[in-house]
């Protein structure tokens, strides 16, 4: 089974959208195996967004992601990364289809409500930043 990380960003948490977003992912047939709420600090943000460190928007991204609480969740299932990416929609909500999280709930390209792993390999790394293996729960979903 493939695992992937979902972050509900500060704009999503502040607008009370966490439950709706998590529910959308479960409706895809993905099983939530880890969940926590936290205030991301600059050190964790730097590690999480390290691939973007040299991009011009990096500083603004770190400022935004550390501006309020986030919800981190791990989902598991067949093709979990692909299913979640499709359900999230394009990075820019203005270019996202209706029916996707960003198309329905995103504000702008920065406040786009969610982050999701873009590959199974990156998911493993990202999950390890937010969860220890002992915090992930294996159970039979019925």
Swiss-Prot record:
Cofactor(s) the protein needs: Mg(2+)
Lineage: superkingdom: Bacteria
Catalyzed reactions per annotation: a 2'-deoxyribonucleoside 5'-diphosphate + ATP = a 2'-deoxyribonucleoside 5'-triphosphate + ADP; a ribonucleoside 5'-diphosphate + ATP = a ribonucleoside 5'-triphosphate + ADP
SMART domains xref list: NDK (SM00562)
Cellular component per GO, a single term: cytoplasm
E.C. number(s) listed in UniProt: 2.7.4.6
GO terms, molecular function: ATP binding; metal ion binding; nucleoside diphosphate kinase activity
Enzyme class: transferase
Subunit structure: Homotetramer.
NCBIfam families: PRK00668.1
Described function: Major role in the synthesis of nucleoside triphosphates other than ATP. The ATP gamma phosphate is transferred to the NDP beta phosphate via a ping-pong mechanism, using a phosphorylated active-site intermediate.
Protein name: Nucleoside diphosphate kinase
Organism: Dehalococcoides mccartyi (strain ATCC BAA-2266 / KCTC 15142 / 195) (Dehalococcoides ethenogenes (strain 195))
Gene name, Swiss-Prot/TrEMBL: ndk
